[in-house]
Amino acid sequence: MTQEKIKIHVSNEQTCIPIHLVSVEKLVLTLLEHLKVTTNEIFIYFLEDKALAELHDKVFADPSLTDTITLPIDAPGDPAYPHVLGEAFISPQAALRFLENTSPNQEDIYEEISRYLVHSILHMLGYDDTSSEEKRKMRVKENQILCMLRKKHALLTA
């Protein structure tokens, strides 16, 4: 597959936390370039808690709140054209819930939402977090990527 400009489809259907859509594109492009991932498209949706819980119930028969849902589409290396890496559905409100006891500043909130997006993309790339060892490995990878994104000023912003 030849690498064309990646189409990053971003939909912000929540109003709780402002998300600068250009920062989403920058994070995704920086991450995919860093990991040497070739794809044509990726879809990112920022949803309200209620909408994400409804999707969680529809996809996994579990109506509980969650921070992110990932639906991989084409596996890395799949010759499909156009190659669609997957869809990430993220609740920015989950970051507020997660950080509610820590007196977070704006930077903390956007870093946590950035973590959710990185987490989803890692799932699209085949990472799993069902066992405690897989969770540990995935968290280490997330932390490495967040450090790289921070250095490149590629975390999400308002």
Swiss-Prot record:
Cofactor: Zn(2+)
Residues the entry annotates as binding Zn(2+): H119, H123, D129
GO molecular function: metalloendopeptidase activity; RNA endonuclease activity; zinc ion binding
Keywords: Cytoplasm, Endonuclease, Hydrolase, Metal-binding, Nuclease, Ribosome biogenesis, rRNA processing, Zinc
Alphabetical list of SUPFAM superfamilies matching this protein: Metalloproteases ('zincins'), catalytic domain (SSF55486)
Cofactor binding annotation: Binds 1 zinc ion.
Chief localisation class: cytoplasm
Compartment annotation: Cytoplasm
GO cellular component: cytoplasm
GO biological process, one term: rRNA processing
E.C. no: 3.1.-.-
Family, per entry: Belongs to the endoribonuclease YbeY family.
Function of the protein: Single strand-specific metallo-endoribonuclease involved in late-stage 70S ribosome quality control and in maturation of the 3' terminus of the 16S rRNA.
Protein name: Endoribonuclease YbeY
Organism from which the protein derives: Chlamydia pneumoniae (Chlamydophila pneumoniae)
Gene: ybeY
